[in-house]
Amino acid sequence: MNYKGVIIFGPWCGEFSYELSWWNPGIRKLRNEDFKDYRAVHIGYKGRRAMYKDFIDDYVSYPKEIEDTLSYPAAGGQHIIDVGEVIPENLKEFMYKVAGEYQDKGHEVTLYQADPNAYNGGKHIYDEEPFGDYVNYEVNSEMYDEIKKEVEEYFSDGRDTIALMARIRDRNRGENTGGCYLNWNPDSWEVFLDKVINELDTNIVVINLSTSGAAGGAMSFEGTELYENNKERIMTINFDDDEDSLDRQLALLKATKCSIYGASGSAVLPFFIKTPTFTQQTVEEGFRLRYKWERDLTDDLKNIKIFDKYRSGEDVYNSSPDELFDEFKEFYRSLV
């Protein structure tokens, strides 16, 4: 194909949920409408190309030495204390380097740079229908088959399997909140999951993501009493340091009965492949999972349960694991 030129989007260095929910759909629309005759390139985090496959030709990941400098993603950029959200200079330099490589091949290059302040003051994130093209993702069939086989061989007992993303983030957001105002007490997670495993007679596949720094991640529970008492019923898959991390997460979500997500914006990920999911949210955040664009992706939130009874901070941190289990049990038993 003869391209008019090359359009490079990025460098994206903000939060995963903002990328998934607003940045990605926004540039999909721009690419398909304004740059449809261009070769499209995206610069961003390693492992996330799955959400760009339908409209980006070349996905360029940050090399490790650059990604290691990114420790505080916030909204659309990296947060600097007393400054706000920014795109660090080393990322801009990397973008120019990538652009130069295309120019050296004779291409005319256009840059569409991420705006770290694009979401300040709630812009876009509170819109029922934000600017963008929202699509359901296709799950990689080979990865689906691999993950499904891996899970079935690990358990080999015929029980339903549930994917788990037990969200945790290490930020100083209150002395009684475990480091972040959206965290849930780790002891409560253990009580809740023990009930999910033993009272509902299920297996759990834990999505393990690094919890280092402020970027957030997911607990693995390895070494806990929960894990020691239920080793044969808990499988952990580490999704760090993997070029296909997001593809593999999507495959896992598709290969399991349903998923459980802690209070995180990434709880919308199952929406993009229409798989059943239950998420613990807060009063201040839960309503953001019920906008029109989310209802459209999920056939009006079919097989989606958002439990958002408690307020952020100590309220949700100290909330009852028994109550959450009762809510999940009702949801789980409603699935056909």
Language-model-detected regions and their locations in the chain:
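A short, glycine/small-residue-rich beta-strand->loop->alpha-helix junction that serves as a flexible
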Residues: 12-22, 170-185
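Nucleotide-sugar donor-binding patch of glycosyltransferase catalytic domains
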Residues: 267-336
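Active-site regions of enzymes building and remodeling cell-envelope glycoconjugates
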Residues: 50-71, 77-80, 220-240, 275-277, ...
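Acidic donor-binding loop of glycosyltransferase active sites
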Residues: 254-260
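Active-site and donor-binding regions of nucleotide-sugar-utilizing enzymes
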Residues: 5-104, 112-114, 248-251, 266-269, ...
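A nucleotide-sugar donor-handling region in carbohydrate enzymes
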Residues: 84-172, 331
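Catalytic donor nucleotide-activated moiety binding site of glycosyltransferases and closely related
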Residues: 45, 159, 164-176, 186-245
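Structural motif
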Residues: 5-8, 161, 258
